[in-house]
Amino acid sequence: MAGLEILSPEGFRLDGRRPNELRRLVCRMGVFTQADGSAYIEMGNTKTLAAVYGPHEVLNKAKARHDQALINCEFSMATFSTTERKTRAKGDRKSVEISMAIKRTFESCILTSNYPRSQIDIFVQILQADGGNYSACINAATLALLDAGIPMKDYVCSCAVSFINESALLDINYLEESSSAPQLTLAILPKSEKIVLLRLDSKLHADNLEKILDLAKKGCKDVYALLRRHVHDFAKDSLASMCT
């Protein structure tokens, strides 16, 4: 990244966006007929699939909870998802870390007490990686859970921010992630602004933390507006098709 200008003197990023702009967000729900719920999301060039199965009987009886559902999450990356073409074994450290982060995020948001002694499986896969993988997975999983009819406290919306050359950049891409600058990934419940995931990848001066946290919250709310509009349109189209 040496010598590469992330932000121009005119205030534009390499992809033409302003510092506080989201990448283009594309959503589709109901992409798998075999799953109880599914979704596909593009955040810029990062492309993600999510599928939800359940609630169903707990596969490992020893893990069953008498008062709530068990949330199982599995993250993977397609072998062609990055330019590195690096083979990532199932269950490698990074995949397990992301799986656990997504699991904990949704355990705090899904109304698990509605489904005692049952299991809900969330599978997410990165098809193409270009930055913001955590956020893309969380946003896709949210849509898939809504498609499955799983009740939640609210949408879970996520966005990543970086702090480069004294500027906070919203919804970072791969080149911006590769700058070694501090990066914050945030997921919130938009209506209450409750934080359900916060990851800071490197040290950041306390004076700058509030600035990037505020921008990340703004990004999450912008994502929420887009997801909510898509869910509304999807429900409207589904109802129309049932009536014809």
Where is each model-derived feature located?
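Polyanion-binding surfaces on beta-sheet-dominated domains and ring/shell assemblies
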Residues: 1-244
